[in-house]
Amino acid sequence: MNTMEAKHQKCFGPAFVEEWGLELYRHRVLDLWNNINLYSDLRGINRFQGLYVTLAYVNANITPVGDLEPLKRWLDVTEKCSNAALIRYMEDDDSPILQKTLHWSQKASELILTMPISERCPFAGVEETLSYASEFCDIVVVSSANSDAVSEEWERYGLSYYTSLVLSQNAGSKEYCIGQFLEMGYEKSKVLMVGDGLDDLEAARNQGVLFYPITIRRETECWDRLQNFALDSFLDGRYAGDYANKLIYEMESALSSDYET
């Protein structure tokens, strides 16, 4: 879905500035938020993980934002990074940082639901690719986003018709979800994960499955290539190797390790 930029620029980032009272540094903090969550090698990480990285950077380089340790402890022990998991954890630890984190996440989710439909649509070529792939493959959505938003977006555009299952943040990590499907009997060489972030790549590699990258700012081109060449290459058993590595290198090169530019 072509929603990530709009969600971060208009929902997650502004809600972050508001929740932590960072109006004095608004422009710098919003740029920082976008660089970390959209354009860095952390692109695609869960909202709570992105929040912690951003808070830690702000705390060290811009202005104090309070004790971050309770948030770090939760992220270290939780199996699922979701509002529901955080609420359960807060039954034993309702530290101020966790209260603010939950309020920020809920506010961001509310803002996402108010986004214009024009800003929550698929990239060109996605439906055609899914339609073609569904003739030969079981398609499963594995997302780190909020479950309500994921389901609503995929159903609105009829994309869920092509899928066998839609999983979101409360199903567990992407790596965990892939592992569950492998336990159902899918051969690793016959599983292709499609993603646009290094967390997607890491999840695929850790589970030993193949990976097809969607490179930022070249999304339409990547979806077209998947439909017209890479998918057939995968189905024929020719995708792994130099060709896949070349595409992955292109995606990695498009992401920065600098949080402020």
Question: Where are the regions that the model predicts?
Answer:
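C-terminal cap/substrate-recognition subdomain and adjoining C-terminal extension
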Residues: 118-138, 145-261
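Catalytic P-loop NTPase motifs of RecA-like helicase/translocase cores
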Residues: 1-2, 201
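Alpha-helical substrate-recognition element adjacent to the catalytic core
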Residues: 2-151, 242
